[in-house]
């Protein structure tokens, strides 16, 4: 479960932990990164210097690659939110997608009824997976924008520093979408159509996008080259 290289460099470890600490000297080395000509107030830095050793928790970001399966084999157990699709904070959308999951799942269970729980749960996942995968990608775009800001260009056009939150993200109604498309999506499951070949359900992701598997290594290479490849479709 890889994580972003800049975070690994701080602790020097790939170990997953809730209790990694970092010293104040390390914080001060990194505190002004990405701020351009601006810097933190010296008084803030003096406060950081006063923090006792081994008391600053380095809450690192661990990533899970997108997985189209969010359920147990019998689709009686399902994960939602970050358990199903982890988000970078830069996406500004992780909590929203978790709420959308809950609304979508509840709607599908109501439509399918207690006699069809596995089908209802599987239909919910199909209605959600590609959308969430695309929203996850937006987090990398925004992280690149925020962490490697070209401040000279921002002075000319401040909008260049504004994180992207396109219409296809905020306009979506997961309850309405589930009720309008449940039966069509459920039928693709009955017919054995792969989720990435469904063409009978309108997209709730960027118009024109064709799903392609991706992982953190792909995105990290793009970030290192300052070009995040979002794939086909209209992402704006």
Language model features with spans:
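FAD-dependent flavoprotein oxygenase/oxidase catalytic domain
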Residues: 1-236
């Amino acid at each position: 479960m890889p994580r972003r290289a800049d975070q690994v460099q701080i602790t020097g470890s790939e170990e997953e932990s809730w209790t990694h600490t970092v010293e104040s000297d390390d914080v001060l080395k990194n505190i002004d990164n990405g701020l351009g000509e601006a810097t933190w107030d010296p008084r803030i830095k003096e406060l950081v210097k006063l923090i006792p050793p081994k008391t600053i928790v380095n809450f690192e970001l661990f990533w899970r690659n997108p997985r189209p399966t969010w359920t147990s084999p019998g689709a009686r157990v399902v994960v939602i939110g970050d358990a199903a699709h982890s988000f970078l904070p830069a996406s500004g959308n992780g909590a929203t997608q978790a709420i959308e999951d809950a609304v979508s799942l509840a709607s599908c269970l109501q439509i399918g009824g207690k006699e069809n729980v596995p089908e209802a749960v599987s239909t919910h996942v199909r209605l959600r997976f590609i959308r969430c995968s695309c929203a996850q990608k937006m987090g990398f775009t925004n992280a690149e924008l925020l962490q490697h800001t070209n401040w000279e260009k921002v002075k000319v056009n401040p909008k260049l520093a504004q994180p992207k939150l396109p219409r296809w993200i905020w306009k979506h109604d997961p309850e309405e979408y589930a009720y309008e498309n449940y039966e069509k999506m459920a039928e693709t499951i009955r017919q054995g159509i792969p989720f990435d070949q469904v063409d009978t359900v309108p997209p709730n992701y960027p118009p024109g996008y064709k799903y392609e598997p991706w992982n953190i290594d792909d995105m990290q290479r793009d970030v290192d080259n300052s070009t995040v490849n979002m794939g086909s479709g209209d992402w704006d």
